[in-house]
Design a protein with these regions (language model features):
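C-terminal end segment of the histidine kinase catalytic
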Residues: 157-199
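Short conserved segment of the HATPase_c
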Residues: 119-132
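Short alpha-helical segment of the dimerization/phosphotransfer core of two-component systems
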Residues: 3-13
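Glycine-rich ATP-lid/hinge loop adjacent to the conserved G-boxes
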Residues: 132-143
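Helix-loop junction within the histidine kinase core
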Residues: 21-32
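Short helix-loop "hinge" at the ATP-lid/N-box region of the Bergerat-fold HATPase_c
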Residues: 87-88
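Conserved catalytic submotifs in the C-terminal HATPase_c
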Residues: 31-36, 53, 58-68
Length: 199
């Protein structure tokens, strides 16, 4: 329902703001543990089922089986929740989203693909630049501030990865990140904002 949609959007915005504030003030700790990334990805994605149903969007999973990785589970859930929200926001009613997980010798590669409005190539860097307040609107005029993707970029880096975006205007977008099977062993993990995050 519309009420559920608004509640979910409000919760995610507040959660994103809290995590972004912690990240920028050096108060976000990374807690790595060994998990099946396929299970985490499916669980986190299904949290967006109600929102997808409002726009009659079909969510498909292309996941071959369990893949063991070392990651911060809460961060990965936040990454997936934001990527799913983004894919739903810019998908047309009755569209579809494909979530895929692939295994490499050292990593798991996770992708969220939509077939929605897409992004102009020159606009992609603006989405990930915290210095630019880049406003966008979804297919039902859902507002997008860019904070979600900036947080996703930050959290992927904290898990030893980078967010990559492939998009074509009018054809849709694919957001991909990787998670290492083994994280580097150290007493402390350097916080990119200047603090020290302890594992």
């Amino acid at each position: 329902t519309m009420g559920n949609n608004i509640t979910e959007s409000t919760f995610m915005l507040l959660d994103n703001l809290l995590k972004w504030t912690k990240s920028q003030t050096g108060r976000m700790n990374s807690v790595f543990q060994e998990v099946d990334i396929s299970e985490v990805v499916v669980f986190a994605s299904k949290m967006s089922d109600l929102v997808a149903q409002v726009k009659s969007i079909a969510v498909e999973y292309d996941i071959p089986g369990p893949i063991s990785v070392n990651c911060d589970v809460d961060m990965v859930k936040t990454i997936m929740r934001n990527l799913m929200s983004n894919a739903i926001k810019y998908s047309n009613e009755g569209g579809r989203i494909i979530i895929s997980v692939r295994e490499t010798p050292t990593h798991a590669r996770i992708s969220v693909r939509d077939f929605g409005t897409g992004i102009r190539e020159e606009d992609i860097p603006k989405l990930l630049n915290p210095e630019i307040h880049y406003m966008t609107y979804g297919t039902k005029n859902e507002e997008g501030s860019g904070l979600g993707l900036q947080l996703v970029q930050d959290l992927t880096r904290r898990n030893g990865s980078e967010l990559t975006i492939e998009s074509a205007e009018g054809e849709g977008s694919t957001f991909t990140f990787t998670i290492a099977k083994e994280q580097p062993r150290s007493e402390t993990v350097e916080d990119t904002s200047g603090g020290i995050a302890r594992p």
